[in-house]
């Protein structure tokens, strides 16, 4: 298992639309395991394969405090959503940035699990928000896309400055 490098905005690879997984095999399972290692190392609650430069429809999530409730969504499809909610979201690909994003309060998704078996899941609250956030990544959408152009530009400038500081520190 390995910790993968997380892409950071404004890296254009974050905008690539992920392709469906054709077959859940040992390679896909290894990607899933590496994604969990990466997510836990980065102290996140969700990670889409796009964020680690793997452009396949794979999401890993664990919103539990104990970090023991792993959820794998391969080729997820949103089949129902209802209600309105929103929280200040953050993202491993957009460090040190949070913003309020409107989301559905409840969702129902269909996906494949780590073994390739189809399942459906109903989720609400934080899990529903996390699923929607990660599914956005699979189509090249970031949570800052919900913000005004001015706020997005400020975030871009802040992150470019941070990247320059980090590269000088190395």
Swiss-Prot record:
Among its keywords, does the record have rRNA-binding? no
Query: Which keywords label this protein?
Result: Hydrolase, Iron, Metal-binding, Protein biosynthesis
Pfam family example for this protein?
Answer: Pep_deformylase
- Indicate the enzyme's highest-level EC class: hydrolase
Q: Which InterPro entries match?
A: Peptide_deformylase, Peptide_deformylase_sf
A GO molecular function held by the record: metal ion binding
Identify the cofactor(s).
Fe(2+)
Which Gene Ontology biological process is one annotated for this entry? co-translational protein modification
Q: Which reaction does it catalyse?
A: N-terminal N-formyl-L-methionyl-[peptide] + H2O = N-terminal L-methionyl-[peptide] + formate
Q: How is the cofactor bound?
A: Binds 1 Fe(2+) ion.
Binding-site list for Fe cation? 91, 133, 137
Q: Where is the active site?
A: 134
Answer yes or no on keyword Protein biosynthesis.
Answer: yes
Q: At the top level of its lineage, which domain of life is listed? A: Bacteria
- What's the EC number here? 3.5.1.88
Q: Function, please?
A: Removes the formyl group from the N-terminal Met of newly synthesized proteins. Requires at least a dipeptide for an efficient rate of reaction. N-terminal L-methionine is a prerequisite for activity but the enzyme has broad specificity at other positions.
Family named by the database record: Belongs to the polypeptide deformylase family.
What NCBIfam families does UniProt report for this protein, alphabetically?
A: pept_deformyl, PRK00150.1-3
* Matching PANTHER family: PEPTIDE DEFORMYLASE (PTHR10458:SF21)
Protein's recorded name: Peptide deformylase
Q: Which organism is it from?
A: Pectobacterium carotovorum subsp. carotovorum (strain PC1)
